């Protein structure tokens, strides 16, 4: 989104639609801006402030790679670059992914892995299920994706949701982990296709719907709720302590 461009105009429309919907909460999963400048971020913040539902914002590579403030502006505007919240029996959690060097790979900082592990250990009481959010997929786009998966694998994660590629694509976490994952659309999918994703989660399934502005939602894909099977890559989950301790 740039001040005055078509994305800005359609972000306003998306906010209006969301405010009239029955959505429980809103998650912005990175790439809010083109170049991550302070001016662009402040402009997006002024639009998102009109959302009348709980809002959680994660930065993407466009916010970190070209940040004018070493990502400090994200904290100044939204208070943090990670979040956790609960909705009924769901624990919804998201962390940042960099890159923290220009043109580098995505990277999960050790302090964020530490926070994720401790946070899920605290929130995952009996009967809880986890939805994980990150701008990057659980693939080699993240240079330490295996460490990330090892933390997630300890908890009842039923889905990981990412952006970055600006398309819909269902996949399973790369190489190990067996975590069900879904890439989702961006606001602008070109050729006048502006919109967002609606997630429906019930006891048995996670479903993703493409919501083009001004049109009815269309089912895209989904999966039955299941939990990653234990394999040789990760030690038994039973009585496992946090990987990252103070």
Roles of regions detected by a PLM:
Residues 1-42:
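N-terminal active-site segment of His-dependent metallophosphoesterases
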Residues 3-6, 32-39, 64-68, 138-142, ...:
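Acidic-and-aromatic substrate-binding clefts and catalytic sites of carbohydrate-active enzymes
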Residues 24-26, 130, 158:
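Conserved acidic residues
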Residues 30-31, 60-61, 135, 163-164:
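Active-site glycine-centered loops adjacent to acidic/histidine catalytic or metal-binding residues
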Residues 118-140:
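Short acidic, glycine-rich surface-loop motifs adjacent to enzyme active sites
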Residues 132-139, 158-168:
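Histidine-centered catalytic micro-motifs
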Residues 200-246:
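A short C-terminal boundary segment appended to hydrolase-like catalytic domains
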